[in-house]
Amino acid sequence: MLPALKKGGRPRDALGRFIRHHERLPVSLADTRGVLFVVSEMADFIKAGGLGDVAAALPRALRHRYDVRVLIPGYRAVLERAGKVEIVGRVLAHAALPACDIGRIVQSDGLPIYILLSRELFERDGSPYVSTSGSEFEDNAIRFATLSHAAADIAAGHAGLGWKPRLLHLNDWPCALAAGYVRWSGGTTPCLLTIHNLAYQGLVPYSMAGALGIPAERVAELEFYGQMSFLRGGIVNADHVNTVSVSYAKQITGPAQGCGLDRLLAGRAAKGALTGIVNGIDASWDPRTDEYLDSHFSVNQWQGRQDNAAQVRKAFGLRESTGPLFAVVSRLVHQKGLDLICEVAPQIVAAGGQIAVIGGGEPDIERQVAELTRRYPGQVGAFIGFEEGLARRMFAGADFLLMPSRFEPCGLSQMYAQRFGCLPIAHATGGLIDTVDDGVTGFLFQHASVEALRRCLERAFRTFRLPGLLAAMRRAAMLRPSGWDVAGNKYLSLYERTAAIAPALATVS
């Protein structure tokens, strides 16, 4: 018999009810309509974070009912992967923002991609936002204002594409100013702004207002403690704002996580114009078929997990063990709680556990992780950097994922881990609240402190010593709905709420 969970948790039959209730939901989408999905990165071409994964997946999740087209800057990496690009339109100069051609390609699955072409602004080495040396490009304000203004021009039908979207879907600060450009020019195209991380706001000095083509009487809409914020301008002017989890949408209306925009966001929420939708994960993350795994497994056949665990231990120089294996797949930064993990590592090792770490980040935390590997050889291993195949094998072989993030707008690693039967141990914040069912599909602790994490680890060790409970939780985690079909249905409703999009089809060229 399963032990009762702690007071305030679910009753002891919660796992059975969870597994019986959660099944894949059918997607029921409306007639095809035109949506321009504006983004600064897309995993098909170039990726700096989770936004790139969303941009690759969400338009495709809606494509079979919506005429979704993506607009992305023509970075060097994009052009290298795009192949032949057809020039189909042009946006004119605006203030100091240069004129740009618009190229078009169609992905193999039929998804149209518009590429904003400017050798001066986008064809350079580095990520979308920083150079190869790690410093931000000095002209980022011009670069992403140009992207935003191009989106507004396309919405107005001024780009010569023979197509006008019924809705602009804008993502994070690099695209947020498009909502302002639409409104400032008298446009009426509905705008949805998705905030993937409120901490990045696109701050620029007031002196740039003229160069960016912001009307003098509208500059106040961007005001942020003596600077201008692209993101604030988007929040003010968008018809609706959403975040990438329900809990994060609530948390950013308060000062603790509102990043100075909490009062504005609370005002939008009070008017019903701020909501949350949890991201999905790609269907290719399937332990039965994953191309990165030598040993596959399923909810009914577990042997492959043991094989993957052995491979992970070998890859990280860990000795053979029957104890629990803890994975860390994360940027090694303070925000992700890596300092907390370093503090509790001795407790994990003393209790018979092992730790495998993959990621890179702040030099001080990298040094702390390296010191742990020296202090506990064969028990703690680390790979500074990132290699996707190794990360997937870690999810497929580890028993637990350590994810004590101080804040987390959504988070993807916990959902990847669950899909592979690896139980998250996570701080109860943002999307982690919405995706980890405490005691059912993982473990949550309420305060980002060493002591709270230690108590949560004790629960995980107790669970590991109860094979029946461990197997039931793994099965519940693997069966948890986390695909883009679920999120797609919610974006369908949000598009219709935002735009009341007319049933007429967009003109397809």
From Swiss-Prot:
ADP-alpha-D-glucose binds at K47. Synthesizes alpha-1,4-glucan chains using ADP-glucose. InterPro entries: Glyco_trans_1, GS/SS, Starch_synth_cat_dom. GO terms for biological process: glycogen biosynthetic process. Belongs to the glycosyltransferase 1 family. Bacterial/plant glycogen synthase subfamily. HAMAP family: Glycogen_synth (MF_00484). Keywords: Glycogen biosynthesis, Glycosyltransferase, Transferase. Pfam families: Glyco_transf_5, Glycos_transf_1. This is Glycogen synthase. Its EC number is 2.4.1.21. SUPFAM superfamilies: UDP-Glycosyltransferase/glycogen phosphorylase (SSF53756). One of its GO terms (molecular function) is alpha-1,4-glucan glucosyltransferase (UDP-glucose donor) activity.
